[in-house]
């Protein structure tokens, strides 16, 4: 009788879910109908037509990059399972996917300056790991997808249906101010060396804009996929979908750590209301760093206190700082607060280990800190900081038990209630003092998300107050993260004082915008997801899901002239329209080719520069003096993104008070005479030259005249083809091959010895 009742209940539940999906199909159709006059045209056929010309290039690059990333992630996940066979399979997979990012940063800093960060090195290490796992396979634990994981998969699918066409239609990442990244990546690929303090080929921005963690990871993908021409641009643009998928699952995992599995899944869907998916299409650290932030915090603070996760989380957090100094630094503050929670649990052993791990994380981030603040350190100092940081994390985490329980729940309960209530009161107090406070701006952009967030915090207080509820020991860390929005207002005011307008302080000028546009919206989704998850788990899951998805899919409110829609709460279908319109027409307006930014007049320049590199005239020491009207990404001939050569712009419309260019190489025409007197090896003109240069600069030969572009080469430059030492450049590969032979030999010996089990 009970079995029959269960079957009937299951059948009723299936029918209810079927009705929900049919209802959402109707809602989606109505949403698409409402968007028929939307300025952004929602059309998959138009997007397909737009990508046809570049599809052979982008699809082949995407396949190669994705295969290398997936294979490498599988090997790392296998190694994690060998170290900790009882770890959750999803955590092992995420550790592999995110761990490759960290590994790219580590290998880049350790091997890049030595000229050993190359395709042979990467594939030989991958082969070594594959062979070792082949002979010593880890146990693969069984796993059934959880509610949160299913919701994260749904979020990934809802994003991919429009972002995948956008990715394949975009050989160059379709977002402004992101092209410094592929320029730095291409420089590593072109010249086969990573120079930490001379890797900003783009030349427009100062050192604070560099993101070595991201740049080295993308270089790893470009080298691993064996891309050459356009490797930097393609490595950036063709990871658009997988890097967003990693961000989504990292969000689920952090939601699970802070609140619950379902809350994490709901949080991934709420990301559609934020600007993160709009900005992540540019694959720059500001947005995609949240993939590392979410994963690093989720692992490091996981309530199971699994030592493997603590170690992985600490290393990933260090890479998060290196992938965006400001947001990664914020994450370190949250992690430090989490360690204080361990102290409140009276677990002094874990507290000390956490402090040591965060010290190791800080050492891992030292190369980025030195680069961003323009404090030159020798190679051995950078390599030692990475190696020492990793060693500290491994040693500290190894001294912990495999797992440990949450202790002193009463103290945690009081701490959670106090912090959450204090945050709510602080926001209200700040709003009473300053009408246009940071959270006022956030609430104007994201009213529903803000409402759900505070409902979630109220629910967290209520649940923490009751003894009969499932514990959420680290819920208040979401409030700690959001409290940075209050502190940031004062830091922003301080950073804009004249005495702090220096190259080393430039990153602090962005504190306010990064907090209200990125950091706070990201951390709003967790308590907001918890509020919805409570209703989902305790009332009717299908009904709550239908209401939530209706709110997310249908465009309830439209801005009449959506020029900049990124930060405003928008629907999933509007997100589709944004992506498909860009896929159909291309992003880079102002350029003759809206996808590559290089048309028939610019392509000969790239071809010629590649020949100059092959001839040995252009090296890592070469700078091209570049005359341009301005350095806007909509008009500048951005040759570094396909060549990696240093660009030194001289602009007609120069603004020396542009603080974001402080520490960069942009100069005005008033400095042209001095620049020419320094006898640069090449001079590129994309605007008519001033009288000081004449028709042809003295001592230079014109080697290109293509439309509006002219390139001059100093007449004493000689061709000196670079010599490569095959054995040296393949030292790591040779060592890996020897390692493979040793593994195979030992395995054969073990197979022939009956005493070996």
Task: Go through each PLM region and give its residues.
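Signature aromatic-anchored transmembrane alpha helix within multi-pass, membrane-resident enzymes
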Residues: 358-362, 416-420, 470-476, 531-569, ...
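Membrane-interface transmembrane helices that cradle and orient dolichyl/undecaprenyl
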Residues: 83, 293-310, 320, 340-347, ...
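Extracytoplasmic
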Residues: 550-737, 741
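Membrane-helix boundary/interfacial segments in multi-pass membrane proteins
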Residues: 54, 58-59, 114-117, 202, ...
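Membrane-interface alpha helices of multi-pass inner-membrane proteins
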Residues: 299, 309-325, 358-365
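Membrane-interface helix-loop-helix junctions at transmembrane boundaries of multi-pass membrane enzymes
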Residues: 143-149, 345-352, 400-415, 457-498, ...
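Active-site lumenal/periplasmic loops and adjacent helix-entry segments of GT-C-fold
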Residues: 150-294, 586-596, 627
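Membrane-embedded, hydrophobic transmembrane alpha-helices
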Residues: 1-145, 344, 352-436, 713-757
């Amino acid at each position: 009788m009970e079995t029959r009742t269960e079957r009937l209940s299951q059948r009723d539940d299936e029918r209810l879910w079927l009705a929900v999906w049919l209802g959402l199909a109707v809602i989606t159709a109505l949403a698409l109908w409402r968007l028929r006059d939307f300025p952004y045209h929602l059309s998959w056929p138009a997007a397909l037509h737009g990508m046809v010309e570049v599809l052979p290039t982008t699809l082949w690059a995407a396949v190669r990059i994705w295969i290398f990333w997936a294979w490498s992630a599988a090997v790392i996940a296998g190694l994690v399972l060998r170290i900790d066979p009882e770890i959750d399979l999803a955590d092992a997979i995420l550790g592999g996917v995110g761990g490759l990012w960290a590994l790219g940063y580590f290998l880049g800093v350790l091997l890049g300056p030595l000229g050993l960060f190359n395709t042979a090195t990467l594939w030989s290490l991958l082969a070594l790991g594959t062979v070792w796992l082949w002979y010593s396979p880890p146990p693969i634990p069984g796993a059934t997808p959880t509610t949160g994981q299913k919701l994260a998969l749904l979020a990934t699918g809802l994003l991919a249906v429009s972002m995948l066409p956008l990715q394949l239609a975009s050989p160059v990442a379709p977002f402004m101010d992101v092209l410094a990244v592929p320029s730095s990546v291409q420089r590593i690929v072109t010249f086969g060396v990573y120079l930490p303090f001379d890797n900003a080929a783009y030349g427009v921005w100062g050192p604070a804009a560099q993101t070595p963690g991201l740049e080295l990871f993308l270089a790893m993908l470009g080298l691993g996929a064996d891309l050459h021409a356009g490797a930097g641009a393609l490595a950036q643009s063709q990871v658009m979908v997988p890097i967003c998928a990693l961000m989504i699952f990292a969000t689920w995992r952090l939601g699970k750590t802070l609140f619950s599995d379902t809350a994490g899944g709901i949080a991934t869907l709420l990301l559609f209301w934020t600007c993160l998916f709009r900005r992540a299409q540019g694959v720059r650290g500001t947005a995609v760093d949240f993939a590392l932030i979410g994963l690093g915090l989720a692992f490091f603070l996981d309530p199971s206190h699994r030592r493997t996760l603590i170690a992985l989380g600490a290393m990933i957090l260090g890479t998060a700082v290196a992938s965006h100094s400001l947001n990664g630094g914020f994450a370190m503050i949250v992690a430090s607060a989490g360690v204080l929670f361990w102290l409140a649990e009276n677990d002094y052993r874990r507290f000390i280990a956490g402090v040591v791990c965060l010290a190791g994380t800080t050492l891992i981030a030292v190369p980025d800190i030195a680069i961003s603040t323009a404090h030159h350190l020798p190679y051995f100092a950078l390599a030692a900081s990475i190696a020492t940081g990793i060693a500290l994390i491994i040693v500290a985490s190894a001294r912990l038990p495999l797992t440990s329980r949450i202790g002193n729940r009463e103290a945690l309960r009081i701490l959670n209630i106090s912090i959450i209530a204090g945050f709510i009161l602080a926001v209200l107090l700040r709003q009473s003092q300053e009408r246009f406070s940071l959270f006022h701006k956030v609430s104007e952009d994201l009213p529903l998300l803000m409402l759900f967030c505070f409902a979630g915090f109220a629910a967290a207080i209520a649940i923490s107050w009751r003894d009969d509820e499932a514990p959420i020991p680290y819920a208040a860390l979401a409030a700690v993260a959001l409290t940075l929005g209050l502190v940031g207002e004062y830091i922003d005011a301080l950073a804009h004082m004249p005495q702090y307008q220096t190259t080393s302080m430039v990153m602090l000028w962005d504190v306010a915008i990064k907090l209200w546009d990125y950091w706070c919206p990201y951390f709003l989704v967790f308590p907001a997801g918890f509020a919805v998850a409570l209703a989902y788990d305790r009332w009717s899951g299908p009904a709550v899901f239908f209401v939530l998805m209706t709110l997310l899919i249908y465009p309830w409110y439209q801005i009449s002239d959506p020029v900049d829609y990124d930060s405003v709460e928008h629907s999933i279908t509007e997100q589709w329209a944004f992506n498909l319109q860009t896929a159909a027409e291309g992003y880079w307006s102002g350029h003759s080719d809206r996808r590559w930014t290089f048309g028939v007049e610019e392509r000969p320049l790239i071809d010629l520069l590649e020949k100059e590199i092959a001839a040995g005239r252009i090296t890592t020491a070469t700078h091209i003096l570049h005359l341009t009207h301005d350095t806007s990404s909509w008009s500048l001939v951005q040759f570094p993104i396909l060549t990696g050569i240093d660009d030194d712009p001289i602009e007609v419309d120069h603004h020396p008070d542009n603080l974001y260019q402080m520490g960069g190489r942009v100069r005005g025409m008033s400095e042209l005479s001095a620049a020419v007197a320094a006898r640069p090896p090449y001079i590129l003109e994309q605007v008519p030259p001033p009288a000081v240069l004449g028709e042809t600069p003295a001592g230079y030969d014109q080697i290109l005249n293509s439309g509006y572009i002219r390139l001059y080469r100093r007449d004493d430059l000689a061709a000196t083809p670079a010599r490569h030492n095959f054995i040296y450049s393949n030292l790591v590969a040779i060592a890996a091959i020897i390692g493979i032979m040793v593994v195979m030999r030992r395995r054969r010996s073990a197979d022939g010895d009956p005493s070996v089990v």
